[in-house]
Amino acid sequence: MIHLGLGQPDFKTPQHIMDAAKKAIDDGHHGYVLANGITECRQAVSRKIKSLYKKDVDPERIMIMPGGKPTMYYAIQMIGEPGAEIVHPTPGFPIYESMINYTGAKAVPYDLTKEKDLKFDPKKILSSITDKTRLVILINPNNPTGSFVEKPAIDFLAEGLKKHPHVYILSDEIYSRQIFDGKEMPTFFNYPDLQERLIVLDGWSKAYSMTGWRMGWSVWPEKLIPHVTKLAINSFSCVNAPSQFAGIAALDGPDDFVHHMMEKFDQRRKLIHKSLNDLPGVTCSMPGGAFYAFPNVSGTGMNGSEFSKKCMHE
């Protein structure tokens, strides 16, 4: 049985990244470090953002996290509360809704539909905003659908969000390096008017096959940095130093591995898309990013759970 449930690449972490961690251990980087991340690592993230998007981000606005979930949790924990509304995608990464419910806020889903090839509709998101809305969550490319929303739709959404200054934006861009067909990532760093209420989540897990290293980064509004730093200090203390030095090597090193992995994922994407659509009663949109396919099995007369069990046992 092939396990397709985990969102992790099946590639080995590149050797130069592992070597950097080993060197950090040999050099004696064994103790506590800054809760927001060692300066060199935050500077490396800032350089990478500049290289990819031509945008300057102050390293003091960057948090190094043990993966992506702390950014999700801290953002929702700080902004969500009873009486507040948080807008999120469905299908989407399921942790978001459970975190929203934990805070007592109301989860307001916006549907990703087959008519839109599972891409979010910016008009639908904007129409979901009320005076109680405190946070809009975006995942692009999307987990678990593999859909990718391009720049014109993001431009439209960003323009609409300018009219709602009471709303924060959490842009989950963890799959930003995994976009197909030569298309570019329409990052929310492109919108200067939103930076004071924008949280961007990204990291090393997907792009560099480092899921087990527990390394993520996020960029926060300056006014929230003291608060998220306190949460970091009082929860995980700091990300272990050798992993941060490995993260520096990943960001500053060659991108050959990233391109090689994407070539392989592209081959798999085309194969799984064709294979799923060849099955009677099954349709599947071509994934535009990440490494997921999200078939519609309603034509088989089964629901998703029944179809999964049938595939596993038969």
What is the role of each PLM region?
Residues 32-66:
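Conserved N-terminal alpha-helix of the aminotransferase class I/II PLP-enzyme fold
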Residues 2-10, 23-42:
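A glycine-/small-polar-enriched, mobile loop at the entrance of the PLP active site in fold-type I
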Residues 8-23, 56-314:
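PLP-dependent class I/II
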